[in-house]
């Protein structure tokens, strides 16, 4: 089911999307191969993930996925679905697309859970996401910093990259 406004369409990904999506990110110098999106589609068919795509005025603008069983153990143990891989192309930012994608993912999550989870990176590239999640009512899950979904022990040294995250939750039901 697609959410339609005058200029924005949020819909589930389909098999025609992976090449377009990959090309859009490749043009920015980001490595997001079509195989990743094809995996998302396979997981959708298996009932494990919902990949939502945003089109702004008919042009690919971004996407987000909802994983029904999180790779992060505390979410999986509590049956908290996880929103992951929120990406809005830079030319389409600050138009409400990220929030619309989150609205759609949270709405889907609310059909199965009263809580949804999300992870956010720790360095400045994630600054906009950090602010959006706080404004939307997400709070840390209390488990501390994670690296590749594993707790970072006090005194440990890690690389602050895309694998370092703070996990957050929000009521949705």
List each model region and its residues.
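Basic/polar N-terminal segments that are highly enriched at the extreme N-terminus
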Residues: 1-6
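Acetyl-CoA-dependent GNAT
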Residues: 8, 15-19, 23-85, 89-90, ...
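Short hydrophobic/aromatic beta-strand or adjacent loop that forms the aromatic wall/cage
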Residues: 49, 161-167
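A short, internal acetyl-CoA/4′-phosphopantetheine-binding micro-motif in the GNAT/acyltransferase core
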Residues: 86-93, 121-123
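Conserved G/P- and acidic residue-centered "switch" motifs that form tight phosphate/ATP-binding loops
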Residues: 96
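Conserved active-site alpha-helix within GNAT-family acetyltransferase domains
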Residues: 99, 123-156, 161
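Conserved GNAT acetyl-CoA-binding A-motif
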Residues: 109-122
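Acyl-donor (CoA/ACP) binding surface of acyl/acetyltransferases
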Residues: 151, 163, 171-173
């Amino acid at each position: 089911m697609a959410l339609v406004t005058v200029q924005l369409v949020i819909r589930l990904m389909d098999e025609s999307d992976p090449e377009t999506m990959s090309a859009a990110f490749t043009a920015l110098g980001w490595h997001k191969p079509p195989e990743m999106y094809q995996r998302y589609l396979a997981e959708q068919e298996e009932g494990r993930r919902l990949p939502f795509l945003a089109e702004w005025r008919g042009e690919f603008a971004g996407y987000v996925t909802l994983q029904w069983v999180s790779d992060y153990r505390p979410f999986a143990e509590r049956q908290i679905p996880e929103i992951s891989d929120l990406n809005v192309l830079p030319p389409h930012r600050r138009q409400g697309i990220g929030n619309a994608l989150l609205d759609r993912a949270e709405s889907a999550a609310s059909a199965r859970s009263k809580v949804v989870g999300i992870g956010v990176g720790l360095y400045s590239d994630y600054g906009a996401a950090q602010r959006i999640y706080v404004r939307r009512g997400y709070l840390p899950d209390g488990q501390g910093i994670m690296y590749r979904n594993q707790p970072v022990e006090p005194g440990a040294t890690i690389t602050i990259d895309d694998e370092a995250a703070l996990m957050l939750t929000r009521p949705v039901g």
